[in-house]
Regions:
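A short core secondary-structure module
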Residues: 154-200
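N-terminal glycine-rich flavin-associated loop
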Residues: 24, 87-110, 136
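C-terminal helix-coil-helix/basic helical segment that borders enzyme active sites and/or dimer interfaces
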Residues: 25-36, 267, 271-279, 294-327, ...
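Amphipathic, small/basic residue-rich leader segments at the start of a protein or domain
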Residues: 1-92, 114, 118, 334, ...
Length: 387
């Protein structure tokens, strides 16, 4: 893809950068761990809603901005590079990339009319409920079931590690509706948080992305009308794949932005820190570390934006998405470890910028699909494409 940006895109990036610096960063300090309806989290969310950052990929007719995936990524990368909290941005991204886009692209006319404007305006927060105690990377081994009756679908099961669960108003829940193997026996449902039989539990504290609330959901014959079936019976796999394409590109732009900020911090440090009578950067080992950090950042960025461009062009390459996602996660963690070493003893302090950056990047190796699983999927897809 071309790295050149149009005047409109430059303005979009500048606006996002200013919003992060002037609005989000001053509010971050008051958001507590887990962000369970804390004043800081809600203040950041409401500010994003007022500035129309809660419906970036949704159509203007639905109250959104109508941005492409690539332009959404530019917004999130710019905010993270400016210093906005990656955890909060992750929460904001899940709402849009994992949920709102699926409702917009796969939902029925009635579903879109009911939910999209609320989601674009930020008054309805979305969450995607997929993982289970015995079904993590083995997604389609899920045991949650939806039983059809004249009244609708009664859903029973447990979902865990759900980003946005404590603050969500609407869940997209994947559940088994048949005995067909793999994805073909899975359907997806729109389940409001107020549904009888649905219980939300706050998740345990995380080392990183602390301002991204997460938790679990228990469903005890939670009844939803048949009109809440998203994507048709047996269509849950397609909904999940669509969500993952957007999520793995959109959310990982946050990691790119955080890598950019960390790289800038490291560059300034090695330029001004003096040891043995000369700046750190004059040491060959330090210079090599800085060069490798920049190489990882730029290579990761190219992979991720190329994968997104293919999605925007209507020709998604799932292998490219998996490879990009995996490489961004690995590169972010590698840069985090390098940053700690460059800052020395100060770099391992709990509240040092290097430690916070590394802790925020570690989840990107696991969330939205573990790194090694992504490589396995990508290889399988490439073998299938080149028999």
């Amino acid at each position: 893809m071309s790295s050149k940006r149009t005047a409109d895109q430059e303005a979009l990036v500048a606006e996002a950068r200013s919003f992060a610096r002037d609005t989000l960063i001053p509010l971050t300090g008051s958001a507590d761990e887990g962000a369970l309806a804390s004043a800081g989290y809600r203040a950041m969310w409401d500010a994003c809603a007022a500035a129309r950052y809660t419906g970036l990929p949704l159509s203007t007719s639905a109250g959104g901005r109508g941005l492409s995936l690539t332009d959404c990524m530019r917004v999130f990368e710019s905010m993270a590079a400016a210093g906005a909290d990656p955890g909060f941005l992750f929460s904001l991204g899940v709402h849009q990339f994992a949920v709102a886009v699926s409702v917009a692209s796969i939902g029925s006319e009635d579903q879109r009319a009911q939910w999209l404007r609320q989601m674009a305006e930020g008054s309805c927060i979305g969450a995607l409920a997929v993982s289970e105690p015995d079904a993590g990377s083995d997604t389609y081994a899920m045991k949650t079931r939806a039983e059809e009756s004249a009244d609708g679908f009664a859903i029973s099961g447990e979902k865990i590690w759900i980003s946005n669960a404590p603050v969500a108003d609407l869940f997209v829940v994947l559940a088994r509706t048949g005995d067909a193997p793999g994805m073909f026996g899975i359907s997806s449902f729109l389940v409001p948080s107020t549904t009888k039989g649905l219980t939300i539990e706050r998740g345990p504290a995380k080392a990183g992305l602390r301002n991204a609330p997460w938790g679990s959901v228990r469903l005890d014959r939670a009844l939803v009308p048949k009109s809440n079936l998203l994507g048709g019976l047996g269509g849950g796999g397609a909904v999940f794949q669509s969500s993952m394409r957007w999520e793995r590109c959109g959310l990982f732009a946050i990691a790119l932005g955080a890598m950019r900020k960390s790289f800038g911090d490291c560059l300034a440090h090695v330029r001004h820190r003096t040891q043995f009578g000369k700046p750190l950067v004059d040491n060959d080992v330090v210079a090599r570390s800085i060069a490798l950090m920049k190489t990882r950042l730029e290579a990761a960025r190219l992979l991720l934006y190329d994968a997104a461009a293919a999605i925007d062009d209507g020709e998604p390459d799932d292998a490219a998405v998996c490879l990009a996602k995996a490489y961004v996660g690995e590169s972010a963690v590698a840069n985090g470890l390098a940053a700690q070493e460059l800052f020395g003893a100060a770099g391992v302090l709990e509240q040092s910028s290097a430690t916070i950056f590394l802790n925020d990047m570690l989840p990107f190796r696991v969330l939205s699909g573990a790194t090694d699983v992504q490589y396995k999927i990508a290889t399988r897809l490439m073998l299938r494409a080149h028999p």
